[in-house]
Amino acid sequence: MNKKKIISTILACAMLPFGGLISASAQDTKPTYVQLNPADASPFNNGEFQGWGTALCWWANRLGYSEKLTNAAAEAFFSDEGLGLDIARYNLGGGDDPTHNHINRSDSKVPGVYSDYKLSSDGKDVESITYDITKDQNQLNIAKAALKANPDLYFEGFSNSAPYFMTKTGCTSGGGTVNSDGTVTSNGKLNNLNDDMYDDFAKFIADATKLFKDNGIEFKSYSPMNEPDTDYWGYGSPKQEGCHFDPGAS
């Protein structure tokens, strides 16, 4: 048998079983019909899209220092002449411990809107917070320019973490085990909001929401947790703020 016949025979033998399988599979498979009802797609807002938009994190924190870039971005994203976005999610930063320098992205290091705070003598409660909205001036500049470009813009606030002094690890990047020598072993599967400070965190959100409203930005809805049931958010992460919550722990 010459070389060409050998190759032809091998190919024919190799293809026969597969051809049979394909044929049998096609004959045995019955069509499945799926009928979609768009009206029942979502129980929220009667199944209708409320709008379309973008989160301000963290490009607003990066661009907001420049009036030129701020206005250009607001027009491009939110005006009728641009994309016409009508929803904006505003990231209320927890604000990490000022002695920490592990978040190495300049845009994701979102400052908290406060300049000082005071804890109770046992450290279990927040007695007072001195608020300062100018700490988040860059993002605020973008939000105001966006509202000017689209007066009907819907703002939703959201938190990635509570302020560092409300967390178990003293870090807004996430959870971990606090060792006897004060060091922390990172563990993104551990809840990081201090058990005694759920009410304090809720008050922080309420106070900050009023602070923004008094400065022209009204949050019409608020998401207090962002992707909470993951193991992403560990102590000392270089990426961003984050806080794990077990289901039912919030």
Language-model regions, residue ranges each:
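Aromatic- and carboxylate-enriched substrate-binding clefts and catalytic-loop regions
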Residues: 230-250
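N-terminal secretory signal peptides that target proteins for export/translocation
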Residues: 1-3
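Sec-dependent signal peptide cleavage junction
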Residues: 17-30
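Short acidic, Gly/Pro-enriched loop/turn segments at secondary-structure junctions
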Residues: 24, 98-100, 232-235
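Short, glycine/serine-rich, charged loops/turns that create anion-binding
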Residues: 20, 160-162, 229
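N-terminal catalytic cores of secreted or lumenal carbohydrate-active enzymes
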Residues: 29-220, 224, 241, 245
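Acidic helix/loop microenvironments that form the catalytic cleft of cell-wall polysaccharide enzymes
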Residues: 224-230
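Sec-dependent N-terminal signal peptides
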Residues: 5-14
